A protein has these predicted regions:
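Conserved histidines in hydrophobic membrane contexts and catalytic metal-binding motifs
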Residues: 1-409
Length: 409
């Protein structure tokens, strides 16, 4: 049994090493994506104009008036003092061709007091420019910038499958790390003084053992992040009833016209606080996303600046029918079945935000360890492969010499 597990561990590890090395390093960085992005791009994120911010709806109107081919798809409903108002936008459809207009940006930062633009960018663009660096790393972490063809997002599927292989390999690795109970101490030790191959081996084995629990959590949540709908939700639904995913709800009826979308946006923002109170949500309305093509708007409930959710299970969201205002779906942290709460926990666990600052630090360390395990695993394989080839070469050389001697006689 053990020889078979060793072979499986070897080939699973080699097959996923490059992907996990990349995911580990990028994950260690993007655990701090908002802070690093703001540090690299102060003009995009900071605003110095004193005064009372304009209402979010007014800022959205000004942006869409300035860029008539763009529609705001997400906007904060309030901003922190000294910060810009940053909106996500998407291209409108050309009424003549029914094709989207070409836009070279999808994110815009405005001074919330004056409404003046402070910057724009294509979030997720494959670029190492300072303005694009952190979003680039984020996209690289989740999609590898692989293409989407025939409706299949190959990057998401690749990382999801890598996560499943990694999860299985994690259980194989822990079995191999403890061959017997008597030698358990060796599986936790690092032979630092010996260095060389001994230390490389211990970094791989013992490093994985010490953080095994965190590694399993990251592996499971990586599957959820990529293949939640295709794999995780069907599996979880076997054990627990799941409410429909609120972020995949589509309202009945045709796509909203621009006028209908604007009117619905204004109505839902006006009613958001009351709807939140009726649902027992204590946080204020903090953000609005709209999908005119699917006929829904969603309101997130959080304090200004906490759109990414700093702790716990994240923020509450209500998804409404844009035409009627009816609540079609909800995600309220801690509510629902055991399966619903499990699904709510996936991103907070994967990002470490479930435990606040300590959790994010732990995730950064785990990302570096994942990269280290990938490198040391390949180094161990190379050394053993060379060791296996050496006797074979010696035997071949001896056979060649013997053949020559027989030929000479």
């Amino acid at each position: 049994m053990r020889p078979m597990l060793v072979r499986l561990h070897r080939w699973f590890g080699l097959g996923t090493a490059a992907f996990l090395f990349l995911a580990g390093l990028t994950g260690a960085v993007i655990a701090w994506d908002h802070e690093l992005d703001a540090l690299l791009n102060p003009t995009f994120f900071r605003s110095a104009t004193p005064g009372t911010p304009l209402p979010a709806l007014e800022l959205a109107k000004r942006l869409e008036a300035e860029e008539p081919h763009a529609v705001v798809t997400f906007m904060p409903l309030s901003v922190e003092s000294g910060h810009t108002w940053i909106a996500q936008v998407a291209p409108r459809l050309n009424p003549a061709s029914q094709a989207p207009y070409a836009l070279d940006f999808n994110q815009v930062a405005l001074d919330p007091v004056t409404g003046e633009e402070q910057g724009r960018r294509m979030w997720g663009k494959a670029s190492l420019a300072r303005q694009n660096l952190i979003p680039f790393l984020y996209q690289l972490h989740y999609t590898l910038f692989m293409p989407t063809k025939m409706g299949i997002d190959f990057g998401v599927w690749t990382m999801g499958v890598v996560g499943m292989v990694w999860l299985l390999d994690g259980f194989i690795a822990i079995v191999l790390a403890f061959p017997n109970l008597k030698s358990w101490r060796k599986s936790l030790a690092f032979r630092v003084k010996r260095g060389g191959y001994a230390l490389t081996f211990d970094l791989h084995r013992s490093g994985g053992v010490w953080l095994w629990g965190l590694l399993i959590v990251v592996a499971v949540t990586s599957i959820s992040m990529n293949l939640g709908t295709q794999v995780v939700r069907p599996v979880v639904s076997v054990f627990s009833t799941l409410a429909p995913d609120p972020f995949r709800i589509v309202a009945p009826g045709p796509a909203l016209t621009p006028a209908e979308a604007t009117a619905a946006r204004e109505r839902i923002v006006a009613e958001a606080a009351g709807m939140g109170r009726r649902e027992g949500i204590t946080a204020p309305p903090g953000g609005l996303f709209g999908l005119p093509t699917s006929g829904v708007y969603g309101v997130g409930y959080f304090e200004a600046g906490n759109d990414h959710g700093d702790a716990g299970l994240g923020n509450a969201w209500l998804i409404m029918n844009a035409r009627t205002g009816q609540v079609l779906g909800r995600q309220i942290p801690g509510r629902g079945s055991a399966g619903d709460i499990f699904m709510q926990a996936q991103f907070p666990l994967h990002s470490g935000r479930i435990a606040g600052l300590p959790g994010r630090i732990a995730i950064s360390i785990t990302g570096v360890v994942v990269a280290m395990l990938s490198v040391t695993g390949v180094l161990i394989w190379l050394k053993k492969a060379r060791a296996r080839r050496k006797p074979a070469k010696q035997a071949k050389a001896a056979s060649t010499i013997g053949t020559r001697e027989r030929a000479a006689n």
